[in-house]
């Protein structure tokens, strides 16, 4: 008889714990130092771990396996309790520190992060992006919103009949000169505000996107702050709200619908950084309307960071399980030897090819996420200063930067959230039947995650909006000799890779595949040639005829950005002993996530030779997987995500997958009362009398003999 951690066995059982301990002991680099790379610096790494520790030790914010058994109502209540608790941290945190705290909560309990983010992110960003400095000070600071106090905002853009086409929303804001008020109306069911996070129960105010109507003239969609509830939390007159009910995930968010019936607000509740309406009804339109949508960019950038953390989490779970799980004895082992161990899942080449790309993606996405986060902060700060000082030159410079940021943030949001969604399900499948258990984290992760592919820009629509300006830039260069600046400046080389140069191959052999800078160049050429071909159709028809190509261009642009920033960050990283391990990860990403997935594009447009693509599949990817394999545990440990953050029975640090999983199942489902509340129905089914007895034997031969006389 043997004794394991908590359970008694009559013979030696599986020992996954020893497997992961052995792997960890044989790792060739320090995960703590590697985390400095992933988080951008030692200081940020230590801050993130400190914030995670606070969450883990907080009795309200702490999350464990019981989280997966909560009902919708329980999730709603617990979410509010957590927001209440986080509001206390917000009072002592800087904005930057609290955003980092929310970034961790986005993995631990995403519905909490979202429900707060609607208020502090979307609502206040809308006011900051569209309101004057005085308006922002009033709504954010004076009213206490920035501290989650006083009032709670929601973001009223989406309608039942309009989502992606924001310019088409139909809620109206009609100016009444006599009272100096706007009258907010929902003219029909299609204009009902829909999917509004916080509207059902929480929000006191809403930043409403509505059509400005003055003297019967429609001036397009502007933004207005509209009170929904009074200080007693009762609905304001003319405001009707409802809960939209059960969703695929994130049930802790009180998404609702809103209808306005002649709701009057003061004229100065209209956000007036760009568009102004005087008391006499004079409308001063913004010279650059697109600036008013800057509020959406912050959310998109945060989703890139969310994608990194989700990729890190699910790849860690699947890889730790793959180390502990053994299945089938190898061909070189005596199948009849009872002492011969089965093969670890992690050692199957197919399993490596399935999972290692997502591990690599987490590393590469982390650098891009940090870069675009820094870029949006600096760009918006420069823009705000330019507008405040009425500096026309600086405004137009900021506009160029904003256009580039729109392309980068849009392509990154769409591509990385798609990638994370794919990773969650592939990692789940790689864990077999156990991956289907809610207690192992994938089910709720997927259901909570996939909305990221839809909100704040549906990924396909967003990808189209990224691809369109790139096509227009190509046409401008080719037809009008224009020069492009910013992150798409490489498009200026279009003549070098089209026309008589259309057959110029960038990736010829394995050596080229190993050179990340050449891979980056190949992505540029692929975008140029794809955009050049799409532009031919666009000139004849319209951009809509190039939809599939536009989405491909957007994805390639995202990978170009991510790999470029990864290479820069590796070159700047002070811990040179880690560079070889990072280079391996970067090459694996470029080989699997980029070249393998887009092999058709690279072959079709002569960017890579057929031999290079053949070598990629037969030699390069298996070789890179073999290089990553000895340090898989160190690579995952480098994410520095605790067991509380991971929240998966099979993904814990100690690797004891069976003990941990079995213990959690017994803890949350005590095997004491084995009869269910519906046992009577089961017993009635199993113990029911025979059909003849239930028919009182009225159709029996005996009855027939009696009745036939």
UniProtKB/Swiss-Prot annotation:
Needed cofactors: FAD
EC number(s) reported in the record: 1.3.3.6
A Pfam family matched in the record: Acyl-CoA_dh_M
Compositional bias ranges of the Polar residues kind: 1-24
Compartment(s): Peroxisome
MF annotations from Gene Ontology: acyl-CoA oxidase activity; FAD binding; fatty acid binding
Catalyzed reactions: a 2,3-saturated acyl-CoA + O2 = a (2E)-enoyl-CoA + H2O2
Coiled coil regions in record: none
Main location as per UniProt: other
GO biological process: fatty acid beta-oxidation using acyl-CoA oxidase; lipid homeostasis
Keywords (A to Z) from UniProt: FAD, Fatty acid metabolism, Flavoprotein, Lipid metabolism, Oxidoreductase, Peroxisome
Enzyme type, top EC level: oxidoreductase
Similarity comment: Belongs to the acyl-CoA oxidase family.
Protein name listed in UniProt: Acyl-coenzyme A oxidase 4
Biological source species: Candida maltosa (Yeast)
UniProt lineage: Eukaryota, Fungi, Dikarya, Ascomycota, Saccharomycotina
């Amino acid at each position: 008889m043997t004794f394991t951690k908590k359970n008694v066995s009559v013979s030696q059982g599986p020992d996954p714990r020893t497997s992961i301990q052995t792997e960890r002991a044989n790792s060739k680099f320090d995960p703590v130092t590697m985390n400095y790379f992933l988080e951008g610096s030692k200081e940020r790494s230590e801050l993130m771990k400190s914030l995670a520790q606070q969450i883990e030790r907080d009795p309200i914010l702490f999350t464990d396996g019981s989280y997966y058994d909560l009902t919708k109502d329980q999730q709603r209540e617990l979410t509010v309790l957590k927001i209440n608790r986080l509001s206390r941290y917000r009072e002592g945190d800087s904005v930057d520190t609290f955003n980092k705290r929310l970034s961790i909560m986005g993995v631990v309990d995403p519905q909490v992060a979202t429900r707060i983010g609607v208020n502090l992110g979307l609502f206040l960003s809308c006011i900051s992006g569209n309101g004057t400095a005085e308006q922002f000070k009033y709504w954010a600071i004076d009213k206490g919103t920035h501290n989650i106090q006083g009032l709670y905002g929601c973001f009223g853009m989406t309608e039942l009949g309009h989502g992606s086409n924001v310019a088409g929303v139909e809620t109206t804001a009609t100016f009444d000169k006599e009272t100096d008020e706007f009258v907010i109306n929902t003219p029909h069911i299609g204009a009902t505000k829909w999917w509004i996070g916080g509207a059902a129960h929480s929000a006191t105010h809403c930043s409403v996107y509505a059509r400005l109507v003055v003297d019967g003239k429609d001036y397009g969609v502007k933004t207005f702050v509209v009170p929904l509830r009074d200080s007693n939390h009762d609905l304001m007159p003319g405001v009707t709200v409802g809960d939209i009910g059960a969703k695929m995930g994130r049930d802790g968010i009180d998404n609702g619908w809103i209808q306005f019936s002649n709701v009057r607000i003061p004229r100065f509740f209209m956000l007036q950084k760009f568009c102004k309406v005087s008391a006499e009804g004079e409308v001063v339109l913004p010279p650059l309307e697109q600036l008013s949508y800057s509020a959406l960019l912050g959310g998109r950038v945060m989703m890139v960071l969310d994608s990194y953390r989700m990729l890190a989490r699910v790849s860690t779970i699947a890889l730790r399980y793959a180390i502990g799980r053994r299945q089938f004895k190898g061909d070189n082992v005596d199948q009849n030897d009872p002492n011969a161990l089965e093969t670890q899942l992690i050692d199957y080449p197919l399993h490596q090819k399935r999972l290692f790309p997502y591990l690599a993606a987490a590393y590469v996405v982390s650098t891009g996420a940090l870069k675009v986060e820094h870029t949006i902060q600096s760009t918006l700060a420069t823009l705000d200063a330019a507008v405040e000082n009425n500096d026309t030159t600086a405004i137009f410079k900021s506009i160029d930067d904003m256009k580039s940021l729109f392309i980068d943030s849009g392509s990154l949001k769409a591509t990385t959230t798609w990638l994370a969604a794919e990773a969650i399900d592939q990692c789940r499948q790689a864990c077999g039947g156990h991956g289907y258990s809610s207690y192992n984290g994938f089910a709720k992760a997927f259901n909570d995650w996939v909305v990221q592919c839809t909100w704040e820009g549906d990924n396909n629509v967003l990808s189209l909006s990224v691809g369109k300006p790139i096509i227009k830039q190509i046409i401008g260069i080719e037809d009008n000799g224009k020069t492009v600046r910013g992150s798409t400046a490489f498009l200026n080389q279009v003549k070098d890779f089209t026309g008589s140069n259309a057959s110029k191959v960038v990736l010829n052999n394995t050596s080229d595949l190993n050179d990340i800078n050449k891979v980056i160049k190949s992505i540029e050429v692929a975008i140029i040639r794809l955009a050049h071909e799409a532009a031919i159709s666009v000139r004849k028809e319209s951009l809509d005829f190039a939809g599939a190509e536009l989405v491909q261009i957007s994805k390639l642009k995202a990978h170009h950005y991510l790999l470029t920033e990864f290479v820069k960050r590796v070159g700047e990283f002070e811990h040179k002993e880690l560079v070889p391990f990072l280079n391996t990860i970067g090459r694996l990403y470029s080989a699997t996530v980029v070249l393998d997935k887009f092999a058709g594009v690279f072959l079709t447009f002569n960017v890579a030779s057929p031999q290079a693509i053949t070598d990629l599949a037969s030699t390069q990817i298996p070789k890179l997987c073999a290089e990553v394999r000895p340090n898989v545990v160190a690579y995952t440990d480098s994410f520095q995500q605790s067991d509380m953050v991971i929240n998966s029975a099979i993904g814990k640090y100690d690797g004891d997958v069976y003990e941990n999983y079995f213990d959690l199942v017994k803890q949350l489902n005590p095997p004491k009362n084995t009869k269910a509340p519906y046992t009577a129905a089961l017993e009635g089914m199993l113990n029911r009398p025979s059909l003849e007895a239930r028919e009182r034997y009225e159709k029996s031969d005996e009855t027939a003999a009696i009745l036939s006389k």
